[in-house]
Amino acid sequence: MPSHPKLQCLKRSFYEPSASVVALELLGHWLIRNTPEGMCGGVIVETEAYLCDDPACHGAPGLTARNKVLFGEPGHGYVYFIYGCHYCVNAVCQPQGTAEAVLIRALEPVFGEELMRRNRPVSKTRDLTNGPGKLCQAMAIDRKLDGVDLCNPASPLIIAQNPEFNRLRKSLGPVVTTTRIGITRAATLPRRFYLKSSKFVSIKERPTSQTIPSGRTTQKEEDCQPPHSRSRITKP
């Protein structure tokens, strides 16, 4: 897949910190899909963090054939199928061997809206990509992209640096931190993040919401070391 000359992928080192840090940092950058029909994508406005000590993380049960991408090199895409009808795309974080990821929940269309509408016909633009399953349908993201290198400009799916990042974070911020959506395990953990002023956030009203300043975060968490049993691939 040819690379776009004006797009600069986020470096692999960007994804090496904890998913809780990367989830905040991704807000304002671009998720871009390259297809034979053209390019589409937009600004990431909502994310969720899943850490290695998190019962809701797909890596919590250990390494399997289905979740092995989670335990691999940071900066790759982890795509899974849910509810028998939707795909979800995540960015893998932390050094190899530690299963953490950021779920990309919503984005604001910037490129190729017409192409996205062909993939997902809707009457309102807001409904095009305001949810993890919706954005995957609009951008034709499925399990074929599981393991895709998000740091390679020639990949069919990348996360690119937004040259207007600082301005956009100020205009759409501050960042709101809330509990995550649609999970039953560790449901009270405040690990969902979104840009408050974006109209493309999936759900804004949550009882534990709090705002944090826009801009680069300095949040740090202790690294999690996967147990020895996770080094063995088991049946999914």
Give the positions of each predicted feature.
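Conserved, well-structured core segments that form or line functional sites
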Residues: 2-224, 228-236
